[in-house]
Amino acid sequence: MNIPNHPETETLQLTKVLHALSDPLRLELVKQLAEAKEKTCSTCADVQVAKSTLSHHFKVLRESGIAQVRIEGKRRYYSLRAEDLEKAFPGLLEAVLNVDQDRW
C-alpha cells in the first residue's frame, strides 16, 4: 500500500499553498473540510466531478500541506491541517474561508 507523505509544518511553502487554493473546486473542498472533521471522496457527493478528478484535487491539497489523509482499509479520510497552516501562515486560512463564493 502506498502511504502518502505529508509535508512537515516547517517545510510548507506559501507558493504551493496558494497554488492549491487557486482552483475553485479545491477551494470548495477546503471549505467543506473546515466544516467537517473528515471527508472521503464519497462524502463529497455535492461536488459534480468524477471520483478520479476529486482524488487528484485531494492529492494537490495533501501535497501542498493543506490537507492530510488517514487510510483505513480501502477508504481515505481527508482532514484540514488548520493548526499547521495557522502556525506557518497566520491568518491565511481564516481569510480564505471568509471570502464570499462569488468572489472566487
UniProtKB/Swiss-Prot annotation:
The keyword Iron-sulfur does not apply. Residues 40-63 bind DNA. Signal peptide: none annotated. InterPro entries: ArsR-like_HTH, HTH_ArsR_DNA-bd_dom, HTH_MetalResp_TranReg, WH-like_DNA-bd_sf, WH_DNA-bd_sf. The keyword DNA-binding applies. One of its GO terms (molecular function) is DNA binding. Keywords: DNA-binding, Repressor, Transcription, Transcription regulation. Pfam families: HTH_5. It comes from the Bacteria. Residues 6-100 form the HTH arsR-type domain. One of its GO terms (biological process) is regulation of DNA-templated transcription. This is Uncharacterized HTH-type transcriptional regulator YczG. The gene is yczG.
